């Protein structure tokens, strides 16, 4: 997850898991280009963001609904691997994650919570927004997430995060908190990003994973957390940031 500045603290990318060489994780700004095979002429996909309907779900119901749509993303680097999180966008295999998860990668694959893995190709890569879209080629439909309308999110709303903190050993970890701020302007290496702020715990390996509302809808892509030092090992807790999904769609 990413880095920037706010007072005496810094917003740092959530480094992506513990891979074989954790130091190979790079900040998206000024990062290395990826050589992951790109699908030429792919039209991509447009997200359909829905307003909440029905009653809020329990934490257990949210996890049961969303976790099957959360994948581990492994980007093979020249030395070691970068490990992050991603979200299945469509049943035919489109996956969204952070650009810094796959930056510098030579090949990439994703793993479902069932353990099934797919090699993926690159559809889109945007360093400015720290987003990447990958494409698997599954024989059977994948469990796509439901995406919510992040424009409706308010401070105090319940928020959940699911991902792979510290790598694959803890994959599928869910944390919870609230939406601490909306439209938070965060400066990262001289660039300003407008993000959702959350108190849900985000750690190494959560990059590219979902921020979820109490209806089990993905409302953001987890990207940053606050650090008090130049180290990617952030020492401040409860200050995480996500790209609003409405800006992604």
Mark where each language-model region is:
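Catalytic-histidine neighborhood of serine endopeptidases
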Residues: 90-92, 96-130, 136-141
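A conserved glycine-rich beta-strand in the N-terminal activation segment of trypsin-fold
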Residues: 24, 53-61, 74-94, 109, ...
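Active-site loop architecture of trypsin-fold serine endopeptidases
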Residues: 9, 77-82, 103-108, 142, ...
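Terminal peptide-recognition signature
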Residues: 6, 37, 68-73, 86, ...
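N-terminal activation segment of mature serine protease catalytic domains
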Residues: 6-85, 107, 249
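Short, well-ordered loop/turn sites that connect or cap secondary structure elements
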Residues: 89-90, 102-103, 147, 153, ...
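Active-site substrate-binding loop(s) of clan PA
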Residues: 61-62, 121-123, 140-168, 243
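Hydrophobic membrane-insertion alpha-helices, especially the h-region
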Residues: 1-3
């Amino acid at each position: 997850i990413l880095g920037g500045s706010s007072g005496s603290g810094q917003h740092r990318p959530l480094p992506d898991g513990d891979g074989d060489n954790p130091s190979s994780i790079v900040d998206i700004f000024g990062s290395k280009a990826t050589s992951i095979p790109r699908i030429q002429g792919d039209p991509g996909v447009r997200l359909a963001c829905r307003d909440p309907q029905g009653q809020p779900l329990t934490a257990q119901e949210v996890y049961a609904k969303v976790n099957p749509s959360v994948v581990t993303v492994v980007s093979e680097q020249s030395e070691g691997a970068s490990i992050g999180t991603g979200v299945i966008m469509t049943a035919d295999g489109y996956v969204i994650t952070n650009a810094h998860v796959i930056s510098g990668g030579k090949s990439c694959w994703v793993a479902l919570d069932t353990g099934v893995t797919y090699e993926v190709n690159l559809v889109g890569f945007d360093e400015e927004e720290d987003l990447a879209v990958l494409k698997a080629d599954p024989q059977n439909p994948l469990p796509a997430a439901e995406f919510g309308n992040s424009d409706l999110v308010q401070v105090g709303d319940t928020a959940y995060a699911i991902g792979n903190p510290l790598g694959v050993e803890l994959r599928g970890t869910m944390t919870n908190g609230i939406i601490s701020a909306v439209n938070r302007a965060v400066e990262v290496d001289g660039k300003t990003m407008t993000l959702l702020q959350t108190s849900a715990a985000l750690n190494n390996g959560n990059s590219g994973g979902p921020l979820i509302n109490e209806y089990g809808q993905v409302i953001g892509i987890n990207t940053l957390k606050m650090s008090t030092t130049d180290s990617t090992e952030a020492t401040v807790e409860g200050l995480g940031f996500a790209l609003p999904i409405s800006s992604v769609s």
